[in-house]
Amino acid sequence: MDKPYPVRHTEEEWRRLLTPEQYQVMRGHGTEAPGSCALLREKRAGRFSCAACAQPLFDSKRKFESGTGWPSFDDPIEGALETSIDRSFDMVRTEVHCANCGSHLGHVFDDGPPPTGLRYCINGVALNFTPT
């Protein structure tokens, strides 16, 4: 995360701003346990935003049930996300992070529903939800 994102903090500041689990996932590129987040079952109309900087990321209309245990979306809000290649665990995946603060959110896969065919598999602990 060497890129100068609009929202920047020292690692010490991030540790103060985030819960230990959020820090481990969002700054340490971790993954929460599947099925562990209440946002997995969130069905109300609203918007999902970055838990680290409040950047709007996904509209609830783009959320779908993937059966994976993590909140899944087929299309982000334009300009909200950036991607990079993740080569950890002897795999090659596309990592998704917040375009505003660089925090790790999850991964994107090409096995989602039409029309995008994409599945943004996002750690629920990295999200906040605001109903509309």
Model-found features: residue ranges?
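A short Gly-Trp-Pro
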Residues: Y5-T132
